[in-house]
Amino acid sequence: MPQMINLGSEMLRITSRGVEYSTSSGRIWSIRYMGTSCGTFVDLLPYGSEILAVTSKGIYYSSNAGRSWSLRYMGTSCGTFQNLMDGGKELLANTDKGLYYSTNGGRTWVKRR
């Protein structure tokens, strides 16, 4: 499960303090986001012009390299999200209830049969 991603000249990672970034190939890290309103960050995924995040409160997205986050999905019918994957034409998610997919950037989810 990627807890560190590359965004061009920056790297982002999840730590116990929140989301950190590095512009020095990982030699020096600084806090990018340490708010608690999103819950605890679990996984990050670059997805088009956004970053998607699995958190303890749902799926969040950032369109400014992780400086701020907005809720994308908070439903409970899929179970607890564990990680996200870019499946090309669809977004895939492992949850404690199985594999789910989304064709609209994570706004709605359908169980893979």
Model-derived regions, located:
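Short loop/turn segments immediately following the C-termini of beta-strands
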Residues: 16, 56, 96
